[in-house]
């Protein structure tokens, strides 16, 4: 069958150009040049169930390692200015049901939209200031506030940069509050 990476890449391509639901993925795929490039892809292989089957086999640790390998490869190959980074922490509310016990991220918390009745997920992102190249991200529970989380997120950011961030005094991090 198709690899987990293929499903991830296809979902990313679809979201970038013409987002459709997973149940409409085959119809979208047929309308693209991808069908000629990947003739082994079938209607059944692009069913929504196949997407969920493949995504459920990926854990956050594996995805984090893949992200880090990608970032490291780009930083090794490109001239990306790491002297300044921008940090943004945000949250977004979801419609995860109140009785859904499987969700560990979606929690009730404060958000600017005033939707405290809905579960939310928090997201932190570091990008290079000059090129807006994403360096690090973290997703965490919606009931954890930014002030508490910032210290942990910044330490994890520097840990992810590794030797590239030896002299933290040489990097300026810009954020709003």
What is each of the regions a protein language model found here?
Residues 163-177:
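Phosphate/diphosphate-binding loops
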Residues 115-122:
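Short, flexible loop/turn motifs enriched in small residues
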